[in-house]
């Protein structure tokens, strides 16, 4: 896949092990962790891996036994492999086939990679600070309990479930993204040897679809210095180097790399092998934290994921789900759904930040963030509303009940709270509080025309759905399923 694709290199010798607090992992906590030794075959059209598990030992590290077979054979994908159907076997929540272990890990580098090319840091490579970022495991660890889909006795609820089962992200989709992340991390470490790359957003937060892009966060500085990366200067400079690297060294594997100079600059690109579109940012640490906050909400109650998916599809169909065009981001939409479920007379969701503040503190080090969902048990709500009623209620709430002029949506507080007086909230038509840093996730909606269009769509869709009780009245079901 990429030029330096050789997974499973042995760790450094004990005298070169890192001692930095950010990466220092307790042997007692991680003695049973395992790494993936993945062998990828382009002969397999669904990009499946043969996975063997190896024991990861901390303290006096003995070398990890690694596969002798190369990860990639250097052969590009055959043309007839590119157009294979996306369909894989659909899985319900209670499927006995759990998702595989997904590892966001940093790999020790060989001697030829020892010096950073970045003029920003001028940092020589020091082996004793590099080791492993703990694994970001998928459902088997993050969601160990069995979750079944809610019952659907009415037509509208059945349609929502049908859409969800057809469009939810599959294991194979996640494998493709994780494989690309692993290889990109190795390549980016040619530029920044101390960096590590995290898969974030809908790919891991439980709200992904078959067509979801991959979001990547490049962490180049260690705690507690994360927020010292200036997004207007340093982040752009870092991404300029990454973009140049993609355009030159990886031009055969990545296509259409584009540097977007937004408030949080990103590099957009497409992986030729997986055909997945990616957005890569630098040190947007809050994105890593909110990924696991949202994942906790996603699996806290079995109606959450289907409801979020149908609302995202509805918003996209009506052109109100694109922050780059002045409407709502998917993240804002998810927070709006969670807020609605928190504010029902009989809430379906609580504020888990209030109930478990120690698990979702902004000060928790990154290598511990992925443990948060494991600490939260299922939430048993007395609310028995079906999915159809909840979708109707969501549309009605934002069409007729929520006060856009004076209120802010707060998932952290589990209620609507008064708008702040800060400059970021002035002249903004929609205010959605980011649960960790308190910023406005809906700041892109800054034109009255776009705001009116959003409100109008809530109102029209509510009336149509209330009268017909058919999802097709607001979202063509067949077309939505085909888009995935």
From Swiss-Prot:
Cofactor section? Mg(2+); Mn(2+)
Post-translational modification Phosphoserine, affected residues: 62, 69, 95
In this protein, which residues make up the domain named PAP-associated?
A: 386-440
Pfam families under this entry?
MTPAP-like_central (PF22600), PAP_assoc (PF03828)
Location within or outside the cell? Cytoplasm; Nucleus
The EC number on file is 2.7.7.19
* Keyword terms of this UniProt record: ATP-binding, Cytoplasm, Magnesium, Manganese, Metal-binding, mRNA processing, Nucleotide-binding, Nucleus, Phosphoprotein, Transferase
Molecular function in Gene Ontology: ATP binding; metal ion binding; poly(A) RNA polymerase activity
Positions that bind Mg(2+):
213, 215
Q: Respond yes or no to whether keyword Protein transport is given for this record.
A: no
* Annotated GO CC locations: cytoplasm; nucleus
Chief place of localization: cytoplasm
What domain of life does the native source organism fall in? Eukaryota
Motif: Nuclear localization signal; annotated at: 76-92
Give the catalysed reaction(s), semicolon-separated. Answer: RNA(n) + ATP = RNA(n)-3'-adenine ribonucleotide + diphosphate
Q: Name one GO biological process term.
A: RNA 3'-end processing
Q: How does the annotation summarize its subunit structure?
A: Interacts with CPEB1, CPEB2, CPSF1 and PABPC1. Interacts with QKI isoform QKI7; promoting recruitment to miRNA miR-122 and miR-122 stabilization.
Cited function: Cytoplasmic poly(A) RNA polymerase that adds successive AMP monomers to the 3'-end of specific RNAs, forming a poly(A) tail. In contrast to the canonical nuclear poly(A) RNA polymerase, it only adds poly(A) to selected cytoplasmic mRNAs. Does not play a role in replication-dependent histone mRNA degradation. Adds a single nucleotide to the 3' end of specific miRNAs, monoadenylation stabilizes and prolongs the activity of some but not all miRNAs.
Give the record's family classification: Belongs to the DNA polymerase type-B-like family. GLD2 subfamily.
Task: Supply the name of the protein.
Answer: Poly(A) RNA polymerase GLD2
Q: Which organism is it from?
A: Bos taurus (Bovine)
Q: What is the lineage of its organism?
A: Eukaryota, Metazoa, Chordata, Craniata, Vertebrata
């Amino acid at each position: 896949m990429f030029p330096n694709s050789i997974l499973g290199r042995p760790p450094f010798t004990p005298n070169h092990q890192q001692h930095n607090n950010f990466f220092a992992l307790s042997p007692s906590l991680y003695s049973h962790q395992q790494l993936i030794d993945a062998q990828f075959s382009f002969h397999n059209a669904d990009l499946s891996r043969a996975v063997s598990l190896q024991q990861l030992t901390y303290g006096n590290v003995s070398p990890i036994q690694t596969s002798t077979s190369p990860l990639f054979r250097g052969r590009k994908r055959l043309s007839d492999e590119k157009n294979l159907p996306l369909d894989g076997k659909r899985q319900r929540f209670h499927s006995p086939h759990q998702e595989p272990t997904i590892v966001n890990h940093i790999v020790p580098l060989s001697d030829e990679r020892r010096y950073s090319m970045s003029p920003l840091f001028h940092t020589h490579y020091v082996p004793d600070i590099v080791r492993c970022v703990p694994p970001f495991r998928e459902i088997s660890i993050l969601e160990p309990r069995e979750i079944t889909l809610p019952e659907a006795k009415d037509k509208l609820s059945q349609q929502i479930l049908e859409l969800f089962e057809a469009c939810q992200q599959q294991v194979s989709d996640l494998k493709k993204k994780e494989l690309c992340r692993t290889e990109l991390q190795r390549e980016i470490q040619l530029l920044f040897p101390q960096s590590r790359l995290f898969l974030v957003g809908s790919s891991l937060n439980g709200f992904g679809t078959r067509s979801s892009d991959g979001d990547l966060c490049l962490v180049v500085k260690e705690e507690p210095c994360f927020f010292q990366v200036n997004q207007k200067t340093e982040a752009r400079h870092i991404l300029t180097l990454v973009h140049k690297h993609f355009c030159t060294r990886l031009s055969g594997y990545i296509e259409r790399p584009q540097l977007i100079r937004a408030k949080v600059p990103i590099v957009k690109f497409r992986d030729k092998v997986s055909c997945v579109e990616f957005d890569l940012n630098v040190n947007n640490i809050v994105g890593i934290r909110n990924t696991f906050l949202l994942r906790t909400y996603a699996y806290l109650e079995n109606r959450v994921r289907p409801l979020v998916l149908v609302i995202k599809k509805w918003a996209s169909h009506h052109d109100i789900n694109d922050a780059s065009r002045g409407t709502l981001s998917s993240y804002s939409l998810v927070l709006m759904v969670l807020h609605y479920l928190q504010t029902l007379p009989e809430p379906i969701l609580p504020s888990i930040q209030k109930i478990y503040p120690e698990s979702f503190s902004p000060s928790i080090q990154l290598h511990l963030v992925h443990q948060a969902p494991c600490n939260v048990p299922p939430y048993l709500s007395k609310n028995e509303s079906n999915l159809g009623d909840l979708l109707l209620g969501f549309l009605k709430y934002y069409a007729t009940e929520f006060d856009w002029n004076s209120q802010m949506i707060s998932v952290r507080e589990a209620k609507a709270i008064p708008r702040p007086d800060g400059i970021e909230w002035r002249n903004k038509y929609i205010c959605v509080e980011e649960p960790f840093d308190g910023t406005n996730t809906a700041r892109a909606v800054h034109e009255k025309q776009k705001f009116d269009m959003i409100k109008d769509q809530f109102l029209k869709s509510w009336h149509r759905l209330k009268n017909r009780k058919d999802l097709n009245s607001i979202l063509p079901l067949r077309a939505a399923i085909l888009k995935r």
